[in-house]
Regions:
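Juxtamembrane boundary at the C-terminal end of a transmembrane helix
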Residues: 292-300
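Alpha-helical transmembrane segments
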Residues: 2-13, 85-97, 130, 161-183, ...
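Alpha-helical transmembrane segments of helical membrane proteins, especially in multi-pass transport
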Residues: 203-206, 210-248, 256-265
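Juxtamembrane/interfacial segments at transmembrane-helix boundaries in multi-pass membrane proteins
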Residues: 137-171
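Interfacial loop-to-transmembrane junctions
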Residues: 263-290
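Cytosolic juxtamembrane amphipathic/interface segments immediately preceding
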Residues: 41-59, 113-117, 206-212
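Transmembrane alpha-helical segments that form the membrane-embedded catalytic/substrate-channel core
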Residues: 14-23, 100-107, 173-191, 261-270
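Juxtamembrane inter-helical linkers in multi-pass membrane proteins
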Residues: 25-46, 190-212
């Protein structure tokens, strides 16, 4: 049954993507897309012919597959549908980092100006996000009495729902949401739908990508977004059920995913694109906020 739920989630990911785009279209007064638009786009990309430059190495072939495997593993290891998994939270983020490294290597291997530009900006953003991510991991470990596995952390947060712990969890949710936007190249840190050289990050790395590889990388990015949403649900919004074991709970999980995606759509609609060199101000503030909250928690 758990495997069935996982496969269903994989098939629903393009629908989640269309849902996010349609909410933004409604808020911007534009025409909505078909529910199956993402499926059509991916099928069209897979039907295109492939082109391999003579200047690229095996990295260009390997990187999209590694990205897909790390995204699937990241989604698979978050135990919303697997009762027996007991994954270390540090290992989880290392798997995510492996995919980011191969994406940058892929951009550099294409030997184009835009690939180098996108890879450099990606490394800059990841270097700024990394300290906040490390503190979020440390914060969860401290809250769970130095337990590093996701199940122990979630169980602790369910059994210790005091006002103080709830406040600290809210701070963690804000930081996790910022990490979600930055890691998935969403507003205000990147615009996934732009091709403007001055602002694009993710699109710059994929600008020279031929169609089948582009389809794999697009699928990987959509899986990553839902995996982060799952992580946010599991760690922060998991106050009633932490394992999906029935169709009712699966429906509750879908409702939570759609709620978070709706919030992402509202946030992206009413906020402007941030300049690259202002990212450090946002994550510097979040870093200081985490340090202050951790200090208060340890001293209380």
């Amino acid at each position: 049954m758990y495997l069935v739920f996982f496969i269903v989630i994989l098939f629903l990911i393009p629908l989640f993507d269309v849902f996010l785009k349609n909410i933004k279209n409604i808020l911007n007064g534009r025409k909505t897309l078909s529910c199956f638009q993402t499926y059509y786009d991916l099928i069209k990309l897979f039907k295109k012919s492939n082109f391999k430059s003579e200047f690229t190495s095996f990295v260009s072939f390997l990187a999209p597959l590694v990205m897909l495997m790390t995204s699937l593993t990241f989604l698979f290891l978050i135990p919303v549908v697997w009762e027996w998994l007991n994954i270390n939270i540090i290992v989880l983020f290392h798997i995510l980092g492996l995919g980011s490294v191969f994406l940058m290597l892929y951009a550099l291997d294409n030997a184009t100006y835009f690939g180098w530009l996108g890879a450099a900006r990606e490394a800059f953003v990841l270097a700024i996000v990394e300290p906040v991510t490390i503190l979020v991991i440390l914060w969860f470990v401290v809250l769970a009495w130095w337990n590093m596995d996701l199940n122990s952390i979630s169980s602790f947060l369910q059994t210790h729902s005091s006002i103080i712990v709830s406040f600290f969890v809210f701070i963690l949710a804000v930081n996790l949401f910022a990490i979600l936007l930055a890691e998935n190249k969403r507003f205000p840190f990147d615009n996934p739908s732009t091709h403007l050289e001055l602002t694009m990050i993710h699109e710059a790395m994929l600008l020279e990508t031929t169609w089948p590889k582009l389809a794999i990388l697009e699928i990987s990015s959509k899986i990553n977004l839902i995996a982060f949403v799952n992580l946010l649900i599991f760690l922060v919004w998991n106050n009633t059920y932490w394992i999906i074991n029935s169709f009712e709970l699966f429906g509750l999980y879908i409702l939570k995913v759609l709620t978070i995606l709706t919030f992402v759509a509202f946030f992206e609609t009413f906020i402007t694109k941030m300049r690259l060199f202002k990212y450090q101000n946002v994550f510097g503030f979040l870093l200081i906020l985490e340090l202050i909250t951790i200090s208060f928690y340890l001293l209380k």
